[in-house]
């Protein structure tokens, strides 16, 4: 059966502009199924026996870019150092497997860590592969560790997952711990702006979102959230925060998780996803809407969007509902590219203005006796003068 004019139009748009998905948990499926050993597993990576993602279906879906989630679960004992350090260790393992996956399949995937590299990957016919982490429990309470993750290619950090942490409150946990952001969290927003890391507000409490939206100098994203007015779920974005997101110039990337789309989750469909996109676009402008599936973070996608091969159906559905080509292109990927460009610009401005980095608060390393010995030795050498 030949494609309809709308389907042909959708395919054309997908070849003109990268459709960039804000969140996919395929790396965690690799951890669960292969224990991260992908040596000799190319056949399975092309056609996975589980989940909504594999290389074959990515190509069929004409995906232009993907933020792969280096997700690890919240520690069972978050207040204990061993749990915090284990989360950081697992995060490094997930970053490693993402990089190995990209390196192993260079004809399909290409690493990207900037707006410019998204375009170069797309023009080369590859899926631009970016990385995000899903919760500040993954940094072992260390801003130094977070900066190193940025150097390893991480370009967004979700402030929380389904647990409170030292920086922010989560959406689905009660009672609240900080009333939104902690003081450390407020300082971290500034540091994330300075280092050029996108701030992701998915999974955070409504109060944390409000505070971060007011504090951040750079646009923020919701990498995988939907609209509270259409589905009253703690993970979704309220109209009040949508208004602040508009002022912030950020993007809400609509999630495909059934529970976030419809009160009767088992009845969620492609049409519900389009409803959420159109609501946000009508409310705050299509310049502030994107796509963040959360594929492989769910057991089953909505009807009509069952896996990563279905992006053409989503684009066609938006066109059928009367969304203009220009607005569809914005939703597909131009908006999140613009946010990344602005995040990069703000970071360059802050660093250029001499903004100092936020440092970890370390325990005392030396006692006063050792400091005095070191000082005396330095003074002794000074008194000796230049040596021939």
Swiss-Prot record:
GO BP annotations listed: gliotoxin biosynthetic process; mycotoxin biosynthetic process; proteolysis; symbiont-mediated suppression of host immune response
Q: Into which EC class is this enzyme placed? A: hydrolase
Top-level taxonomic group: Eukaryota
Q: Does the keyword section mention Nucleus?
A: no
Task: Give me the residues that bind Zn(2+), please.
Answer: 23, 25, 134
Pfam name, any one: Peptidase_M19
Give the residues annotated as coiled coil.
none
Q: Which cofactor does it need?
A: Zn(2+)
In short, the EC number is 3.4.13.19
Binding of substrate occurs at: 161, 235, 294
Keyword DNA-binding carried by entry: no
Q: In which pathway does it act?
A: Mycotoxin biosynthesis
Could you say which protein family the record assigns here?
Belongs to the metallo-dependent hydrolases superfamily. Peptidase M19 family.
- Give the record's keywords alphabetically: Dipeptidase, Disulfide bond, Hydrolase, Metal-binding, Metalloprotease, Protease, Virulence, Zinc
Catalyzed reactions per annotation = an L-aminoacyl-L-amino acid + H2O = 2 an L-alpha-amino acid
Query: Which gene codes for it?
Result: gliJ
* Taxonomic path: Eukaryota, Fungi, Dikarya, Ascomycota, Pezizomycotina
What's an example of a GO molecular-function annotation for this chain? metal ion binding
Q: List the disulfide bonds.
A: 74-163
- Record protein name field: Dipeptidase gliJ
